[in-house]
């Protein structure tokens, strides 16, 4: 009887030992079956914030949710999404130039924006100011840049709040399909909790900036969720670029239909036909003359003029095009101030084009040689806006 009891006790102990070892091995090798909620995973994202997923990857910067509208930080939009937005902090005006639609402007705290001289309405406030940060509404951003960027979708109320968009259609990223169904885990190991069930053949974006760890690779789903999957399940990895949903608008300019042979005509006073005759007599194949008629003379967008209608008539009679030149040689002016402010930039552009039209000039030649780095952003905006008006008026811009 005692021997039987010992045998039974031995069996029990053995079973307990096997069970304990099994439990240890299961705990060591079995995957986590716990699904982490999106709310828990993105608990650091405030209720009024939204993730921004740009070209397949999340940004550090966050968007805002005001009422029912999602907003993007304007600085982020300009730096990383579309450089054609220009923010005039001094005069509180946002400008956007479209080669097709022209110049569009909007001020903070309004639902109205201007296209040329026409006012248009958006449903929600376009620009929102939060402390030192300016935000632009996602609907307005999409309205302005649909040919330059692609808004895939914006999700409000579905954790995590996020905006998915593309802006870079030149660089490539790595895409892959899953060879097996799997789980998207929060860390590089099967012991980590999982976020999503992923299907076989589901497309993911591979984070090529990070190395595989524990045979798990960091990936992003196409709707912006970050996690890890077994590296062996990533099949058909292909470098590809994002595709535009529409053709990109391009800035085109009027030409003269042939090779330009240009000569500058330096002037310090108004001259007429006789002076032109003496200068072009030995000019050979010259077909464009650029008299140095205009000079910026203050910080309000005004300029001096030596323009002569007689000179233009004489040049045209000789088959020459006339491109009036404007310079920035006055040491007392500031290009950053002139071009950086919406009002002075607009005054300069409108006066240049109206003067060119009045004297029947064929073109305008910009000779700004004092462009400091701090004025570069404003100068590019100036040229964009000027090019639109020149093209509309049939004037060459050089």
Question: Predicted regions span which residues?
Answer:
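Boundary/entry segment of secreted carbohydrate-active catalytic domains
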Residues: 181, 225, 230-277
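Short, solvent-exposed loop/turn elements at domain surfaces
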Residues: 185-187, 269-275, 297-300
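SH3/SH3-like beta-barrel fold
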Residues: 96, 201, 215-222, 229
